[in-house]
């Protein structure tokens, strides 16, 4: 077989590769050691740039070596002439571009480029925008490059309209571009700022309708791509609610004033200050949260001195001023009354969704019908199903309540991995609907039984509720936010899966608590109930703790004020 090329065996090939790797490793370690020695000795010269170039050219993610290069460049700035420094910077920019070709998603390389350009007196931002465009042509989802482009656009004061046009070009080329859609959500509010009186964070209606048409084209082209669906969800999002005092409640019995707000706030911080006026005179009080935790909360309360509740006067006027929101609310406590309150006459638009014009309602109704048609063609498309639900919520949550629940069942079957999330979202929507119905009826009783709830939310909306029925659901716990229900007298929570009562604390009016057929294991889990001073009736039938020896004696010691315990 003379004259034929000898072919290496697999073992020989493996050995050759091993030797090659060892040689590269030795060179890598040798260069790295030399860099660190020079750095320790303070020899920050161009030889360090050469050594680090050898390493970073192959592995741009060595962050420490980028730090070394910055130290060298800072040193050379004081030693080089302007012409020499310009040549050095030009070479550094070229080296950075070569590193990005090795790894276009190198954190260290992009950061070093930002640092370098930030030190130049007159950077060539046009060149940097072209660089971004080239790398985004290779990978339009490179979020490192997108971050860098936003940095460049900010530094160069590129008009938002030009950047929006750039996203148009990329989206037109490929709808599946989450970064482009996200960038649009940042640019459009800059291009179309709302007046001070308008809803902040939202778009003018004509712009919104055009964007809805664009994104609809995207998800009809590729129904399974999630980026357009997420952008569509942002478009449907409600505006940031205006700061408001939702409800003000005064109790003579508890000598307490309670306030609920449109958003969580931390009273006592530099920006969040509450002032209390009683009969037009300022009163210094200490504010606290219902659950005693010093953290942002929708509900805050304070104790009132006896003088401010004197029943000899015909009435007392309480006014709370929220300085950050520049809003205030007042209520009157009449002689002979044990409580007084003032509550916003809220509508569903103010509480949970945006108010829709006739034109926008027509467009959303058309979108809903189109999504239903798409769902018939793509019956297992989870994004389409979820969007149908959200469109129904945006249009009329009460009108579409029954249909929405049916779509939730379909969505859970299509996407079983997110069943828990969908159960919680469904619970949230059901509770919102129940709050709306209660608002319209102007009652203080809320029935949430047999709704298959898995979570409780919006409890700050229930400040005035006296009777709450949560029985026959799938609740595993009662959240600390339950302490916001300062007027609650009767709580029915039987036939759930409740294991903890940590949230049932500091309810000053709670008299009856029904917890039949839950999963309460030990008497110790009832300890939080000791903070409810008026609790007299406690029904624990059907819970595992009822089987404990001497349970009645333990409960009598644990909850001495409860006169009737059913086990």
Swiss-Prot record:
Look at the named UniProt entry and state the broad enzyme category this protein falls under.
transferase
Q: Does the keyword Plastid apply?
A: no
In its keyword annotation, does this UniProt entry include Transferase?
yes
Q: How is its activity regulated?
A: The enzymatic reaction requires the aid of a Rab escort protein (also called component A), such as CHM.
Q: Where are the transmembrane segments?
A: none
Q: Which reaction does it catalyse?
A: geranylgeranyl diphosphate + L-cysteinyl-[protein] = S-geranylgeranyl-L-cysteinyl-[protein] + diphosphate
Q: Where are the LRR repeats?
A: 442-463, 464-486, 487-508, 509-530, 534-555
Example GO CC term: the record gives: cytoplasm
Residues modified as Phosphoserine are 98
Pfam families named in the record: LRR_1, PPTA, RabGGT_insert
Q: Which UniProt keywords apply?
A: Leucine-rich repeat, Phosphoprotein, Prenyltransferase, Repeat, Transferase
Q: What are this entry's molecular-function GO terms?
A: Rab geranylgeranyltransferase activity; small GTPase binding; zinc ion binding
Q: Which GO BP annotation is one of this protein's?
A: endoplasmic reticulum to Golgi vesicle-mediated transport
Q: Where are the PFTA repeats?
A: 44-78, 88-122, 124-158, 159-193, 207-241, 363-397
What is this enzyme's EC?
2.5.1.60
InterPro entries in the cross-refs: Leu-rich_rpt, LRR_dom_sf, Prenyl_trans_a, RabGGT_asu_insert-dom_sf, RabGGT_asu_insert-domain
* Cross-referenced PANTHER family: GERANYLGERANYL TRANSFERASE TYPE-2 SUBUNIT ALPHA, PROTEIN FARNESYLTRANSFERASE ALPHA SUBUNIT/RAB GERANYLGERANYL TRANSFERASE ALPHA SUBUNIT
Q: Which family does it belong to?
A: Belongs to the protein prenyltransferase subunit alpha family.
How would you summarize the oligomeric state and partners of this protein?
Heterotrimer composed of RABGGTA, RABGGTB and CHM; within this trimer, RABGGTA and RABGGTB form the catalytic component B, while CHM (component A) mediates peptide substrate binding. The Rab GGTase dimer (RGGT) interacts with CHM (component A) prior to Rab protein binding; the association is stabilized by geranylgeranyl pyrophosphate (GGpp). The CHM:RGGT:Rab complex is destabilized by GGpp. Interacts with non-phosphorylated form of RAB8A; phosphorylation of RAB8A at 'Thr-72' disrupts this interaction.
Q: What does this protein do?
A: Catalyzes the transfer of a geranylgeranyl moiety from geranylgeranyl diphosphate to both cysteines of Rab proteins with the C-terminal sequence -XXCC, -XCXC and -CCXX, such as RAB1A, RAB3A, RAB5A and RAB7A.
Name of the molecule in the record: Geranylgeranyl transferase type-2 subunit alpha
Q: Which organism is it from?
A: Homo sapiens
